[in-house]
UniProtKB/Swiss-Prot annotation:
The chain crosses the membrane at residues 5-25, 31-51, 60-80, 86-106. The keyword Membrane applies. It is found in: Cell membrane. This is UPF0060 membrane protein DSY4629. It is a multi-pass membrane protein. It holds the Pfam family UPF0060. InterPro entries: UPF0060. Belongs to the UPF0060 family. HAMAP family: UPF0060.
Length: 108
């Protein structure tokens, strides 16, 4: 379980970090190499989920969606200095519960 959580976090950081660099390049006139590095990081994001032990592509990517929401709230708070409000935190907790149910609910 620890391995899965680490991979979810790494993938989320790669997705958000890569996307953020592309955003800075295109929206805030940063140098072209921001976009190149961001694109390479996004390719890495595409590879990381393949390291998961869960057999279902759909389930893994759905779970990444929930983790992404949580990490995006934290990224916005830490990097963009946008303090999350109560609704942001409530939404993040709901996503975390959903991810937990999807991945670790007992199945036959």
């Amino acid at each position: 379980m620890f391995y899965a959580i680490i991979l979810f976090i790494l993938a989320g950081l790669a997705e958000i970090g890569g996307g953020y660099l592309v955003w800075l390049w295109l929206r805030e006139a940063k140098p072209f190499w921001y976009g190149i590095i961001g694109g390479l990081i996004l390719v890495l994001y595409g590879v990381i989920p393949t390291l998961q032990k869960f057999p279902s592509f759909g389930r893994v990517y759905a779970a990444y969606g929930g983790v992404f929401v949580i990490l995006a709230v934290l990224w916005g708070w830490g990097i963009d200095k946008k303090v999350p409000d109560n609704y942001d935190w409530i939404g993040a907790v709901i996503c975390l519960v959903g991810v937990s149910v999807m991945l670790w609910a007992p199945r036959n």
